[in-house]
A protein has these predicted regions:
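Conserved alpha/beta enzyme-core scaffold
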Residues: 1-442
Length: 442
């Protein structure tokens, strides 16, 4: 069956004011790029003509400049959920120019299924391959999964595919697509380890839901992170030493724990320090986002296997995966965010959660979303999904920010995302505050 080929501009003309749009991807990885940009251009034309045009945007997590950035600058977004890292979007949110709901990433697909965010009119999905078998289409995703299975199934008006030749023929066998059931009919998720497969390597949909295919050849808009510093390197070393001390004292199993690591230069430094510590056994990763350091640890064998939702890596690192794809099919799995961040699975398999704080207070509370308690930074992301259900929950940050002018350790947080009930340790470049088994005054 021949699928309808469209330009991004033709797709944009089919999107109407007030439509609810579900996108593939998780971080800039796997996000459609041509169509969102074309929608932003349409919005500018409509506004210049004096006509209203705004859409509601639902994603797995953050996106790239061609999506969050361009749509925001074109004033094309009315409502957005659940997470973003784009500086242009942040500026408009903090100026109260659009509506934004920050939520736990594990819950996004469920919120859509329950109808709490309205309906999904269109799904726009980046794919690496499309197989047509009878009246069904099998969609092979690219460098992330996010909420793609859910928005594909829910899309009332149809699905547009961005067939990205940059990934064509290279991602088959990496994904494990599984969607949980509706309440109250959910069954247990049949996973006891990070490398268990429970679904299919593709999304299967009725072929008649596909309204058109846009071809492109574009690399992911990989985020740039702050270069490692003496501070981040020391934090990484302190985390590795803390885990090693726990291992020696029998507080974590001899086989070690599965690691969840957040996003950014500190997270890369932590994984690097763990990989360099010979006394730490080889370990698995169960996380939402894989960064460059994890790819190297997989290739070296220090990481035995990694489960994630997204490959938030440079294109050079992605090409390493493609060059060694048969190896990575055995050692890497990409899942929907409601599985990669699922509290049930995290609690079962034994995870050490390591995330970054904006500020932490002397009671053990953590702020990870709002600067000075009022200005949104990015969002809670998956930090609560992992922190609240982990075997061991760690937050790290530099002791100061803004060139040493503002302390990150405060008497009481200006905003609290994670209460002391779920925070086991806070680590800076100066050391570790182990909060387990002590009272507030201690």
């Amino acid at each position: 069956m021949e699928l309808n080929k469209l330009t991004a501009q033709e797709v944009a003309e089919m999107i109407q004011d007030g439509d609810d749009i579900g996108l593939s991807g998780f971080t800039p990885a796997g996000v459609p790029k041509m169509v969102p940009h074309a929608i932003s251009e349409k919005a500018l034309r409509e506004h210049e003509a004096g006509r209203p045009f705004k859409i509601n945007v639902y994603t797995g997590a953050s996106t790239g400049q061609s999506c969050d950035g361009d749509l925001t600058n074109a004033q094309a977004i009315h409502f957005r959920a659940p997470y973003t890292t784009n500086k242009d979007f942040r500026r408009h949110v903090n100026a109260d120019e659009l509506e934004y709901q920050d939520m736990n990433l594990s819950n996004m697909a469920t919120q859509l299924r329950q109808g709490n965010l309205g309906n999904v009119d269109w799904a726009i999905i980046e794919v690496s391959d499309i197989d047509i078998i009878g009246d069904k289409a099998q969609l092979y995703l690219t460098a992330a999964v996010g909420i793609s299975p859910t928005v594909c199934r829910m899309a009332k008006k149809g699905i547009f595919l961005e067939y990205n030749l940059h990934h064509a023929g290279k991602m088959r066998g990496i994904h494990d697509v599984y969607e949980v059931e509706y309440h109250p009919y959910r069954t247990p998720i049949n996973m006891t380890g990070p490398m268990d497969r429970i679904g299919k390597p593709y999304i299967e949909i009725p072929v008649d839901k596909i309204r058109g295919v846009v071809e492109c050849n574009i690399a992911d808009e990989a985020r740039s992170f702050t270069a490692p510093s003496d501070t981040t390197d020391q934090i990484g070393q302190n985390v590795a030493n803390f885990l090693l001390d726990n291992l020696r004292n029998g507080l974590i199993p001899k086989t070690f724990l599965n690691i969840q690591s957040g996003v950014g230069s500190t997270a890369n430094a932590v994984l690097g320090a763990m990989g360099n510590c010979e006394e730490i056994p080889n370990f698995g990763i169960y996380t939402e986002v894989l960064q460059n350091s994890a790819v190297e640890l997989l290739l070296s064998g220090r990481v035995t296997g990694a489960s994630a939702c997204s490959l938030t890596i440079t294109d050079a690192e992605l090409q390493k995966i493609y060059a060694n794809i048969e190896f990575f099919k055995k050692h890497l799995i990409l899942r929907p965010s409601e599985i990669s961040n699922n509290p049930e699975v995290i609690a079962r398999i034994g995870v050490c959660a390591m995330n970054t704080a904006i500020e932490a207070d002397i009671y053990g509370h953590v702020n990870s979303t709002k600067i000075c308690g009022t200005k949104m930074m990015n969002g809670i992301g998956g930090s609560a999904d992992f922190t609240n259900n982990a075997y061991l929950s760690i937050f790290s940050c530099g002791s100061t920010t803004k060139e040493g002018k503002i302390s990150s350790i405060v008497p009481f947080c200006s905003h609290i995302d994670h209460t002391s009930h779920f925070v086991d340790a806070v680590i800076t470049e100066y050391g570790v505050a182990d909060l387990r088994g002590i009272g507030d005054m201690e």
